[in-house]
Amino acid sequence: MENLSERFNVLQDQLMNIYESAAETLESQIEHWQILRKEAVLLYFARRKGVTRIGYQPVPTLAVSEAKAKEAIGMVLQLQSLQKSEYGTEPWSLVDTSAETYRSAPENYFKKGPMPIEVIYDKDADNANLYTMWKFVYYVDEDDNWHKSESGVNHTGLYFMQGNFRHYYVLFADDARKYSATGHWEVKVNKETVFTPVTSSTPPDSPGGQRDPNTSSKTPTTTTDSASRLSPTASREQSQQTNTKGRRYERRPSSRTRRQTQTRQKRSRSKSKSRSRSRSRSLSSNRRSRSKSRRKASTTRGRGRGSPTATSDQSSRSPSATSSTTSLRSRGSSRVGRSRGGRSRVGRSRGRGKRSRESPSPTNTKRSRRQSGSSRLHGVSADAVGTSVHTVSGRNTGRLGRLLEEALDPPVILVRGEPNTLRSFRNRAKHMYRGLFSSFSTAWSWVAGDGIERLGRTRMLISFVSFNQRKHFDDTVRYPKGVDRSFGSFDSL
């Protein structure tokens, strides 16, 4: 207990020295976050040991200490990466590198130079809202290179330039739906009107604009810090879901037809059974000879009408009907034998003999199934790859057949989130989940059709060899917080 108190007091003294010096260097800010990490680890250890208070300092719960330690580790890694860039020599204060500033809009970016932006709704000075625009925003590109960008404001919202693209982090149209009755607002910078009153329906194709006030909730927005807003990809996913639902509904008539045919076969069997029973009761020795002659005639007619190939095809196509009629005949003959007393054994033996001669053998049925299934094992042509739109069934297909079926529809996972979060997830997956995926794409975004604004959040594609591999990946991998996913497939990768 005394050792914990001494170490905790030492960390507090180091923090006080940093606060009093107020050095504006990245070295000092990295040291500050290192001390905060040590403090969180110490409090976590104390809580594990059952200590609830160190001096006058109450010990937080394990979850709080763990979250603070992880936050400190993440900030140290980001600051160390920034220190290696050309912007590492710039002045950086405690406010610039604080967690609150880092998490404010735009989230997960270092920024400097806050400026207040006032937006007045419905030309009412009392109905106004204040926003913070940052003069400079620092971001990392796909090659882990740091860039410094200037932020700006227009009638649509607040943005910063990411190359040649405008990355909006505040959209005025979103708050106009809450605070405005007419959908009009004006933007003021330093109490000067920069943009005259505009309506949310004026720029229909711009980020945050509306085409119709009744369908405002369905229109895609371009903000990057909100997970609940729809993007163009989300709308396409909804349309794909509706298409797949339509395709699923199309399968039902075929299943109903099979059920109808089965019921018809059952009815015909029951009718034939009743007829055979009535006939078997009134059969005599003369009618036995007639039935034998009829069977011989039907046999000769079947051979004379069609070729042996056609006969074998008919027998293979309708094994159920042949077996049912054969069993009925055997039942009739056996019952006649039983009525005669002494000839009951003969009747039974005749029934068994007819079953063995006329019923289709199970080996023939298996051969026909193998012949029909062997066509699936010849491979998939290049033109057929990606043509399947249904999930592969695991029934009546071997391992090779399933792989060939899955080749028709290469699966992917689309993940959406912040660019830095997706890159970290990609790097972690390459080391921890190797073999569970085929490849990762770079981080990318949609671009407006009539502008250069980036739409929605950053995206990344993950490709797989098969659906089983994608399912195993999705069940095993733990996605970062704020990252959502959706499934899909392509004709080719």
Curated annotation (Swiss-Prot):
An example molecular function term from Gene Ontology annotations: DNA binding
Compositional bias (Low complexity): 215-228, 315-336
Keyword annotations of the record: Activator, DNA replication, DNA-binding, Early protein, Host nucleus, Phosphoprotein, Repressor, Transcription, Transcription regulation
InterPro entries tied to this protein: E2/EBNA1_C_sf, Nucleotide-bd_a/b_plait_sf, Papillomavirus_E2_C, PPV_E2_N, Reg_prot_E2, Regulatory_protein_E2_N, Regulatory_protein_E2_N_1, Regulatory_protein_E2_N_2
Subcellular location: Host nucleus
Chief place where the protein resides: host cell
GO biological process: DNA replication; DNA-templated transcription; regulation of DNA replication; viral DNA genome replication
CC per GO annotation: host cell nucleus
Subunit structure: Binds DNA as homodimer. Interacts with protein E1; this interaction greatly increases E1 DNA-binding activity. Interacts with protein L1; this interaction enhances E2-dependent replication and transcription activation. Interacts with protein L2; this interaction inhibits E2 transcriptional activity but not DNA replication function E2. Interacts with protein E7; this interaction inhibits E7 oncogenic activity. Interacts with host TAF1; this interaction modulates E2-dependent transcriptional regulation. Interacts with host BRD4; this interaction mediates E2 transcriptional activation function.
Protein name stated in the entry: Regulatory protein E2
Source organism (scientific name): Human papillomavirus 19
Gene: E2
